[in-house]
């Protein structure tokens, strides 16, 4: 494996938490941890869950949040390398990652999502990313048929420069998270595309 494709942290896989595994606790020590959950109102929870999951897996959650996504794959699958970019105009910070895990929605025989599941993906940072760590993006269809968008992360600055800029980095992360939530709501509201 080339140096540019090696993960920048050792504690991999903590974002891979299938339903009903708790998102509280169990995170690696020494990292700043974020766990955000946002209810998504949906007249048809199954359709909204499927649409949100497919949007997450096809990078559309990120694009809808205003990030550029460069990947040789149209879908998040383990091993896929992706570079997200955020910023204004030509001033963009590139953030290379590799997908660690992904989970598609589980459907019944009628093509409806079965309640009590979590789907999405998690990726880890590669050299050149401003932080070291991992982030997970999930759609959850609870056992009582509610749709929830979840974003988790554990990270630390990748260099002294980013450590000094950590207050700005945290503000940027909060802003991007708010954009993810808006994007998740739009994806869920759009319903699933053709299968």
Language model features: what each stretch is:
Residues 1-89:
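Hydrophobic ligand-binding cavity/cleft-lining segments
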Residues 2-5, 156-195:
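A conserved amphipathic terminal alpha-helix motif
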Residues 36-38, 139, 151-153:
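A structural signal for short, well-ordered beta-strand segments
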Residues 50-61, 101, 128, 144, ...:
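Short, intrinsically disordered, mixed-charge
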Residues 83, 122, 147-150:
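General beta-strand recognition
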Residues 89-143:
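Hydrophobic-ligand binding "helix-grip"
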Residues 125-129, 152-159:
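Short, solvent-exposed aromatic-acidic interface loops
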Residues 141-145, 154-156:
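Compact beta-sheet-dominated globular domain cores
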